[in-house]
């Protein structure tokens, strides 16, 4: 079976990823023929966005199994060697919980199968299931979130939580897409999202392709456009949500949440249940990835800072649950108190 979306294509023998580092100026694709290439693509942000990383890792796991099964026909040995594949993929990005969720799911499927025969097909089917479920989940998130947006609303978003950050459709941008599909006129302000410029490079490009009225602003303009009354709601995605509703997302999200709170603007987080980590009580326990100093020292490949200056470059921050108006999931919209209602969500659904 095969899969093809804007973000990725699974051919059965390789995983082809759109190189998000090159957008919007070039549409270049990277072909990953083994799990090491998949791991490198995740680490170097050829692919990014928590749900997309999870699905990518699942296909990387399949490629690892294909490689190992060519050398070994002993099921127990395969299981042991697949632990190395899982570890290689898992250590690429520490913050996005979907990565670990997808790999755990693949490993459980491996163990549940319990034999060498038919193993690759079973794992491939599971990876495809993860990918296709993501699309269905995102559309459900979109439908649930669209009810929060009125016709004529202007929405601010940060980073990119669209089709490029998922297998397809998107979480935060999926809400905007669903609202548009319902006939609502929605305008969008997109933060540029320094230092990696996901808002400028990816969100603006993606929304323009879909015919949205989108305005790009630098990150330090967000407070001013809010004060001017231009923004009706903020919608962002998430890389990990703690059991109490604290949200780890792209650096700068916390700043936007504080500003929205100050101006009385609802701040919504759109994310699948797979992004909620019930093993983590609060955002204080979420590991925050730090990336290369060069991302801050340069812009568009040109150096913008003096030599030898100190640099701090966390890729994510944590927004306190008190600043979150609601969390939009595929099962419905969750409101405070989050610790209680998130638990109910997993136990009963909404």
UniProtKB/Swiss-Prot annotation:
Q: What class of enzyme is it?
A: isomerase
Q: Give the binding site residues for substrate.
A: 48-50, 93, 198, 249-250
Q: What SUPFAM superfamilies does UniProt report for this protein, alphabetically?
A: NagB/RpiA/CoA transferase-like
Q: List GO molecular-function terms, semicolon-separated.
A: S-methyl-5-thioribose-1-phosphate isomerase activity
Q: What is its EC number?
A: 5.3.1.23
Q: Which residues form the active site?
A: 239
- Functional note: Catalyzes the interconversion of methylthioribose-1-phosphate (MTR-1-P) into methylthioribulose-1-phosphate (MTRu-1-P).
- Which organism was this protein described from? Fervidobacterium nodosum (strain ATCC 35602 / DSM 5306 / Rt17-B1)
Reaction catalysis annotation = 5-(methylsulfanyl)-alpha-D-ribose 1-phosphate = 5-(methylsulfanyl)-D-ribulose 1-phosphate
Q: Its GO biological process terms? A: L-methionine salvage from methylthioadenosine
The family note in this entry says:
Belongs to the eIF-2B alpha/beta/delta subunits family. MtnA subfamily.
Name of the protein in its database record: Methylthioribose-1-phosphate isomerase
What phylogenetic lineage does the species belong to?
A: Bacteria, Thermotogati, Thermotogota, Thermotogae, Thermotogales
- Known InterPro entries for this protein? IF-2B-related (IPR000649), IF-M1Pi (IPR005251), IF_2B-like_C (IPR042529), Initiation_fac_2B_a/b/d (IPR011559), M1Pi_N (IPR027363), NagB/RpiA_transferase-like (IPR037171)
Which pathway is it part of? Amino-acid biosynthesis; L-methionine biosynthesis via salvage pathway; L-methionine from S-methyl-5-thio-alpha-D-ribose 1-phosphate: step 1/6
Superkingdom field: Bacteria
List UniProt keywords, sorted A-Z.
Amino-acid biosynthesis, Isomerase, Methionine biosynthesis
Residue numbers marked as site, Transition state stabilizer: 159
Position of the signal peptide? none
